[in-house]
Amino acid sequence: GVLDAFKKIATVVKNLV
């Protein structure tokens, strides 16, 4: 769902930072 996609993006951002 949209929430899962948001969580996935958030995780990627954290990994990049």
UniProtKB/Swiss-Prot annotation:
Keyword annotations: Amidation, Amphibian defense peptide, Secreted
TM annotation in the entry: none
Protein location: Secreted
Pfam families: Antimicrobial_8
Coiled-coil ranges per UniProt: none
Tissue distribution of the protein: Expressed by the skin dorsal glands.
Record-listed Valine amide modification sites: 17
Gene Ontology CC terms: extracellular region
UniProt keyword annotation of Secreted present: yes
Record GO biological process: defense response
Keyword Amino-acid biosynthesis: no
The protein's name: Uperin-3.3
Originating species: Uperoleia inundata (Floodplain toadlet)
